[in-house]
Design a protein with these regions (language model features):
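A nucleotide-sugar donor-handling region in carbohydrate enzymes
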Residues: 88-161
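Catalytic phosphate/metal-binding cores of nucleic-acid and nucleotide-processing enzymes, i.e., regions
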Residues: 131-146, 203-206, 210-219, 235, ...
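Conserved catalytic-core segment of nucleotide-activated headgroup transferases in glycan assembly
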Residues: 142-200
Length: 299
């Protein structure tokens, strides 16, 4: 019987969610979904002794929530050892830990990137009632001029084994090489307010703020002046594309399947490609319907 070790988070509220996940697996154990031998452990157990000696790669699995305070360290180790892992985090629609909501769960991936066809009528149900709308696609004349760049947080950069500013530096450098110097003023960098900064072990050091920066401006306000949003994996990219703004993301973004590419800036300052709506944009609704998302090959 395969084993599933579910680790807590060292925080009471989110540990309760990992316990609920473990209990859910036990409740639904059957020939199709398992059966799993499930055990819940505190994350300190992994930090002190590592994985249990009876954990077998290719057969058993681990699960946890988030990447801070040891959970990310555990997930990175699982990936390196070829151990399947289930990752939980905020949902893409109705995120948060309070009220009636849900969590996103992905297998062997930090992000849900699977999209499947979903009827547009679904937007008239739950999502419309909770304020979510898939707005009409805007053409270049209906959008602003800013190129809004959203770098990954320190915690995300650490989890993906990147230098703190590696993605940002590469993105800005490529943008400036594609645009004439007279257009560089359009590039606006927006960092996550209260950005989590971690040490080499993934432990939270601080929630960093950037007074006087573009981060102080409400994101909704910045979108009014944006031609495009370029993001590593920020959930703000989902908000942008739902409002008819094109996005350019990394493969670690939930919007990767509707993402444009920086190459569209070759020989043009306002890419005409942005006028065309990604045909699968309405299918982003699928991100709220799936139970387990597995990574798929790029289309």
């Amino acid at each position: 019987m395969p084993k599933l070790y579910v680790y807590g988070t060292d925080r009471q509220k989110t540990t309760k969610l990992t316990i609920a996940f473990a209990r859910g697996v036990i409740r639904h154990n059957n020939a199709t979904n398992g059966p799993w031998q499930v055990k819940h452990l505190p994350i300190t157990n992994y930090l002190e002794i590592g994985f249990p000696s009876d954990l077998v790669a290719g057969q058993d699995a681990v699960a946890t929530l988030g990447v801070l305070r040891g959970t990310g360290l555990m997930l990175k180790s699982a990936k390196a050892k070829g151990i399947d892992y289930y990752y939980m985090d905020h949902a893409y629609f109705m995120p948060g830990y309070g009220g009636k909501g849900w969590m996103r769960i992905s297998k062997n991936s930090h992000t849900c990137t699977t999209l499947r066809e979903v009827s547009k009528d679904k937007w008239n149900g739950f999502h419309k009632n909770y304020g979510y709308q898939c707005e009409k696609w805007k053409n270049n004349n209906q959008r602003g001029r800013d190129i809004l760049v959203l770098p990954p947080t320190g915690a995300v950069s650490w989890f993906f084994d990147q230098g703190k500013e590696e993605w940002l530096d590469q993105t800005i450098s490529e943008l400036k090489s594609l645009l004439p110097e007279s257009e560089h003023y359009r590039i606006k960098i927006r960092r996550k307010p209260k950005e989590p900064v971690v040490d080499a072990q993934g432990n939270l050091i601080e929630l960093k703020t950037y007074p006087g920066s573009h981060s102080d401006i409400p994101f909704e306000t910045q979108l009014l002046d944006a031609l495009v949003v370029i993001a590593y994996n920020s959930m703000a990219a989902l908000q942008a594309t739902m409002q008819g703004i094109p996005v350019i993301t990394s493969e670690n973004s939930c919007c990767y399947r509707v993402s444009f590419n920086l190459d569209v800036y070759k020989n043009q300052h306002d890419p005409q490609e942005f006028d065309t709506e990604p045909p699968n944009r309405p299918h982003l609704l699928y991100l709220s319907l799936i139970h387990i998302s597995e990574p798929t090959r790029p289309i």
